[in-house]
Amino acid sequence: LLAAAGAAPQLLNDAISTGIIVAAESYGEDTVAMVRAIVALDRHGIEPRHLRAMRASAERDVALIESSLSSLLRRQDAGSRAKVNELAPELARRLDDVRHAFVASALMRIFP
């Protein structure tokens, strides 16, 4: 992971100790991409400890998606499961769109 993401051992340790990355025997491409992003942010003074709130926000997003799909999740049929698998990523993308709009709007106020 260190070599693939270009991360220093201490940065990875910080990401693990703050709960941004979960320690594991092996890591997938999603984790490699996340660590690469953490490396890039760290170059600008944004450390793993600063990302805790983002992790908590992501967990709240998942809870919101789960709640919105609760009626489908209670069903056991294949059609409902397929619909959940279709809708969950779409809802996540929409939440990202809203978050992006909030950030873009705030940046425009700061840097007109």
Go through each PLM region and give its residues.
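Arg/Lys-rich, alpha-helical DNA-contact motif
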Residues: 3-112
